[in-house]
Amino acid sequence: MKLVFYGAGNMAQAIFTGIINSSNLDANDIYLTNKSNEQALKAFAEKLGVNYSYDDATLLKDADYVFLGTKPHDFDALATRIKPHITKDNCFISIMAGIPIDYIKQQLECQNPVARIMPNTNAQVGHSVTGISFSNNFDPKSKDEINDLVKAFGSVIEVSEDHLHQVTAITGSGPAFLYHVFEQYVKAGTKLGLEKEQVEESIRNLIIGTSKMIERSDLSMAQLRKNITSKGGTTQAGLDTLSQYDLVSIFEDCLNAAVDRSIELSNIEDQ
């Protein structure tokens, strides 16, 4: 299986590093390319033991899966450049935010299968939650192979393309939303009189430990919460205060704003 990666930004690097480290693919069958920084590309390719090239004919020849990881505003120029070299065997996997499958096919001037994936930055540690949507001309074997590739850097949720907006909001942007919540927790903890460094380190370990509890337990998060909440205790006192605020509405507004922006970005013709 030959894989080609167009674009070598942070997300693309996290993805193909995960694939290289977690699959049985031969490094000689993996090709990287970027827009222009050959020195950085060469160094990264040599570090991973894979190939790099700027020759589109070489890259696309016999390529099974072609990852489109360029910045969205660079895609039209990339499509113009590579479309003369596309073969019938190329399946495209886009990690570009906001660019619909139909637009990708239109710019590439082909009817090759196209999948869109929406990972998050946790791909860097092999724990992305990645939404994926397929064009209707994928065969089952190719779908399975792509799912296996994506699972190399986390878990997969297959949805319709329209629902990628919701996945973008919930899991794509999710790490940033959680970081923001944790930031506020640190600020509040510091106001109790502890040193900021102590609070930050404590909360980092609190997050790690709580995540492991969720990972290793078959219980719901609600049940895990109940298990550590004693009637009349300190935890109950804090939760009673939290329940005075409509946290659900706050998060609904947050997620809806992200969904709306994702939809706006996908309206290519309006830009």
From Swiss-Prot:
Q: Would I find NADP among this entry's keywords?
A: yes
Identify the EC number(s): 1.5.1.2
Q: List the InterPro entries hit by this protein, alphabetically.
A: 6-PGluconate_DH-like_C_sf (IPR008927), NAD(P)-bd_dom_sf (IPR036291), P5C_Rdtase_cat_N (IPR028939), P5CR_dimer (IPR029036), Pyrroline-COOH_reductase (IPR000304)
Pathways involved: Amino-acid biosynthesis; L-proline biosynthesis; L-proline from L-glutamate 5-semialdehyde: step 1/1
**Which molecular function GO terms apply here?**
pyrroline-5-carboxylate reductase activity
Keyword vocabulary terms for this entry: Amino-acid biosynthesis, Cytoplasm, NADP, Oxidoreductase, Proline biosynthesis
Relate the protein's function as given in its record.
Catalyzes the reduction of 1-pyrroline-5-carboxylate (PCA) to L-proline.
| NCBIfam families membership | proC
Q: What is this protein called?
A: Pyrroline-5-carboxylate reductase
The species this protein was found in: Staphylococcus aureus (strain COL)
